[in-house]
Amino acid sequence: MIVVLKHNVPEEKRNQLINWLKAQGLDVHPSLGEYQTVLGLVGDTSRLDMSLLESLEIVDSVKRVTDPFKCCNRKFHPDDTVVQVGDVRIGGGNFVMIAGPCSVESEEQIVYVAKAVKAAGAQLLRGGAFKPRTSPYDFQGLHEQGIRLLEIAKQETGLPIVTELMNIKHLPLFENVDVIQIGARNMQNYDLLKEMGSVKKPILLKRGLANTLKELLMSAEYIMASGNDNVILCERGIRTFDDYTRNTLDLAAVPMLHELSHLPVIVDPSHSTGINRLVPPMTLAAAACGADGVIVEVHNDPIHALCDGAQSLTCEQFAEVARKVRAVRKAVAE
């Protein structure tokens, strides 16, 4: 249920209503907009008298929300959420480029790539330290050493770092990580999602390879209902019957998610295609369809990469894509 308050309601009266609603056993999520305030109610609202609420002088309207996701629902929070990562704002009309290697391999590699992507316009550095691989025989990442190397790259460049958390026992290693990524394979690891609710860091939540948008939003709901509103959604391709690309990039999900939710939505053109020559056009398509950013894999020597070299751009290719993204964003804005 949502309660829309009239314009310019005094704070004292608003708080009186919020406290009364909490006394009814409900969680209240206020969204203070420029022109109206919306109170999102989570819990058993079946016994609330809608006509009584509507009769209050400070209430404009009351609506029941049938969607199972509440906290991330745009009806609860009409304005776009902007996730702040240092000086970087994700959402609210900004377009953020997150770039870096699939896996951290060495100090020389990660520092070189970090400097290159920053020079090209990337605002955040991605890099895998713990790698979930389909085969147990593939490179699994440098683990704790990989985190330390990311921290060195952060010190060298000032770029905030994004890396994947697979197991809650590794969380103490992530103290200097700026954005924690929950990968596609863990999108429905509900115990892990609930733990992310108590983490005071932004969470980048990737859509699972066979999950619906509702399931993605319900996973975001787990994090938000547990106390962390700083969630970034990521469309990274879904499994379909076609096998020319690794996955099928569902770009229609971007405007649909923006319609359903107030959370920022970014796109992963690397994992969704699996082919580096397809990454540039899909990056531009993401910029054109209204995404709030992209997360792109970049490697200084893709042919010899220990992980996913086939989908990685060279530093020079990324610089060219970043230049074109700026042109697309300008054209879309006009």
Predicted feature locations:
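Active-site mouth loops of central-metabolism enzymes
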Residues: 95-112, 136-140, 160-164, 183-185, ...
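Alpha-helix-loop-beta-strand connector modules within alpha/beta enzyme cores
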Residues: 139-163, 195-202, 251-265, 311-333
